[in-house]
């Protein structure tokens, strides 16, 4: 490898909304804020998280629902 062309790695902390703190190496050099991590992601925990998108679906059906019917 050529000397002097590679970025420097710094240890940063990635803070999750669940409170989990992860130390990682990064070239960005700033701390990160995560929405989900391995400790709280539904795939890894085995729990379902309900996302309320009913308002969007109702709004879409109200606008375009009659177009598909004959």
UniProtKB/Swiss-Prot annotation:
Q: Which UniProt keywords apply?
A: Metal-binding, Ribonucleoprotein, Ribosomal protein, RNA-binding, rRNA-binding, Zinc
Subunit (UniProt): Part of the 50S ribosomal subunit.
Report the Pfam families cross-referenced here.
Answer: Ribosomal_L31
From which residue to which does the signal peptide run? none
Cofactor(s), names only, from the UniProt record: Zn(2+)
* PROSITE patterns hit by this protein: RIBOSOMAL_L31 (PS01143)
Spell out the PANTHER family in the cross-references.
Answer: 50S RIBOSOMAL PROTEIN L31, CHLOROPLASTIC, LARGE RIBOSOMAL SUBUNIT PROTEIN BL31A
Q: May I have one GO cellular component term?
A: ribonucleoprotein complex
The answer to whether UniProt assigns keyword Cytoplasm to this entry is no
Cofactor binding description: Binds 1 zinc ion per subunit.
Q: Tell me, what is one Gene Ontology molecular-function annotation carried by this entry?
A: structural constituent of ribosome
Residues annotated as coiled-coil are: none
Name its GO BP terms in alphabetical order: translation
Family label: Belongs to the bacterial ribosomal protein bL31 family. Type A subfamily.
Quote the function comment for this protein. Binds the 23S rRNA.
What protein is this chain from? Large ribosomal subunit protein bL31
In terms of SUPFAM superfamilies, this protein maps to: L28p-like
Q: Which residues bind Zn(2+)?
A: 16, 18, 37, 40
